[in-house]
Amino acid sequence: QNIRQIQGMRSIVSAVYDVKPGEVWPEESIKHIADECRKNGLIFDVVESIPVTEDIKLGTAKRDRHIENYCESIRRCAKYGVKCITYNFMPVFDWTRTQLDKAAKDGSTSLVMYWEQLNGLDPLKDDIHLPGWDASYSQDEVRELIKAYAELGEAGLWENIGYFLKKVIPVAQECGVIMALHPDDPPYPIFGIPRVVTCEENIDRYLAIVDSPSNALCLCTGSLGCSRGNDVPELVRKYSSMHRIGFMHLRNVKILSDGSFEESGHLSREGSLDMNEIIKALVETGFDAVSYTHLRAHETVLDL
C-alpha cells in the first residue's frame, strides 16, 4: 500500500525469504506475494533472488537435487506471473562491504568497501564477519568453504557454472522466464576466493555457455563500476543491443585512489560513473526490461 503511493510504480521485486536455500519455494508463498501486489494495483514480475547453493557452486553430491528444486521454483514463479529471476554465482559471500553506515557530506549514509579495513584480515585465522556475508554460516563453516573453493579454483567454478546453466536455462526458456545474472560484487577476488563474473570477457563467456534469451544479465552498474577496467556505458550499450539484459541495477560508485569504493549519489557528479551515458545507452538501444535503483543504505528499492 505504501509503495502504491509513489507515482509511476507498477511492479514489485520480491522473493520468498523464509525457505532454506536448496529447497523448493512453496506455491502458496509465491501466490501470496502475487495476490498482495494485485490487490494494490501492482504486479509481481521480478524475483531477487533464488539463491544458488554452495553445493551447486562446488558441485557436491547434493547439487542435482538442489538444481531440480531450483527448476521447480522457477516453474512455480512463472505460474504467478514472474518474468525475470535475478541470481548470482558468488562463492561463499554475496556482496561484500566493510561498512554500511558511512556518513556522507549531505548527511545520508552509504555502503563502502575500504581496503584498509580488509587488509590484514584472514578468515582462515580470524573470527570475522562482514556485511553481505551469510550469517547462517559458522566461522568453521566459512573456513571450510574457503578451503573448498581454493581447491576448486577458477576452472572448476566455470565447470560448475556450465553444469548449472545447461540444466536451468532450458526450463526457464520453456517457462518464459529470463534468468538475470548479477555480477560479482565487487568484481575481483577477496581472500583468494575465485570470482569470475567480473568483466566483458567473462560475461561473454558466461552468456555463450547457453545461447538463449533466457540466459541474461542483471547488469548492476555499481558492481561492474567498482573496477576501473570496466567501461560501464559501453557494456550497457553492448548487452542491451544484444537483448541480454533482463534487469538493470542503476547505481553510482566513487572509486578511491587505492581501489576502495563508496556507493555514491546517483548523479554523475557524485561518483565515478557517467550515469547520463548509461541511461542514454539504454534509451538508444530500446531497453524495455526492468530497472531499479536503491538508496545507498540498501533500505529502499524503487522500481522505475
Could you tell me what each predicted segment is?
Residues 18, 50-51, 89-93, 183-189, ...:
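Active-site-proximal loop/turn and secondary-structure-junction residues that shape catalytic pockets
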Residues 10-13, 43-45, 83-86, 176-180, ...:
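Structural preference for beta-strand elements that scaffold enzyme active sites
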Residues 2-8, 28-45, 78, 170-174, ...:
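Acidic (Asp/Glu)-rich catalytic clusters
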Residues 12, 77, 182, 248, ...:
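Conserved, mostly hydrophobic/aromatic
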Residues 3-7, 15-70:
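Trp/Phe/Arg-rich N-terminal binding region typifying the photolyase-homology
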Residues 293-300:
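Conserved small/polar residues in nucleotide/adenosyl-binding loops
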